[in-house]
């Protein structure tokens, strides 16, 4: 996140080499980058640059996700020493402690000219197939270089039947239940409670009464393994 911000702020076009060393590695998972450090380093040395989109959230940049609501706080609130010791499990345990604090957030979104408004339990504007290592989007509907975000909004289920329906829709990646809104868009304008915090690539971002989120098409180049069939 900081590297991308630095490059774009400087107007540089330097290819980025990425070694996944985090607890969840959503970004690497979506790009199918090796999680083995030596293999990742080899990809940087022997690979080739491939162009990818990034997001701009107001005045900040993000590589793969801007999210709000349930369980998003755990990504930045979990102490680093706990992440180091427990890895992805640390996020799960932290998420459990958040259960009593979960609430709906009233949000209005203008998505490429269409308006969506309601009380949402969770929302994500992403360019990734994996969010938090728990929620996985359909790879067939996610292209990290097509100039579009995937937007997923989850309304709070009101009974056990709706909970089951919502979980089933997320697991099947069909997104066809009443609690879910799934769209693709290049630009989103958001109106929300300015006290509602956001998470950008796992880092805390203060709330905004109004903020515009824009997909920057092919804004970065990332080193990837060469296509041997090309």
PLM features: residue spans?
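Glycine-rich phosphate/pyrophosphate-binding beta-alpha loops
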Residues: 67, 71, 124-140, 204
């Amino acid at each position: 996140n900081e590297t991308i911000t630095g490059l774009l702020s400087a107007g540089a076009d330097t290819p980025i080499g990425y070694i996944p060393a985090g607890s969840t590695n959503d970004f690497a998972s979506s790009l199918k980058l090796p999680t083995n450090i030596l293999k990742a380093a080899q990809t940087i040395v022997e690979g080739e640059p491939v162009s990818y989109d990034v997001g701009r959230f107001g005045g900040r940049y993000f590589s793969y996700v801007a999210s709000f609501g349930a369980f998003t706080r755990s990504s930045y609130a979990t102490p680093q020493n706990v992440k180091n010791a427990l890895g992805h499990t640390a996020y799960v345990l932290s998420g459990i402690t958040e259960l009593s604090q979960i609430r709906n957030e009233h949000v209005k979104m203008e998505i490429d000219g269409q308006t969506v408004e309601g009380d949402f339990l969770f929302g994500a504007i992403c360019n990734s197939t994996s969010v938090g290592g728990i929620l996985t989007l359909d790879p067939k509907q996610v292209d990290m270089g097509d100039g579009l975000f995937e937007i997923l909004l989850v309304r709070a289920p009101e009974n056990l039947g709706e909970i089951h329906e919502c979980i089933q829709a997320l697991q099947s990646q069909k997104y066809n239940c009443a609690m879910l809104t799934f769209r693709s868009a290049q630009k989103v304008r958001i109106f929300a409670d300015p006290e509602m915090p956001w998470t950008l690539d796992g880092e805390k971002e203060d709330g905004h009464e109004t903020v515009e989120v824009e997909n920057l098409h092919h804004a970065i180049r990332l080193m990837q393994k060469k296509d041997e069939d090309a």
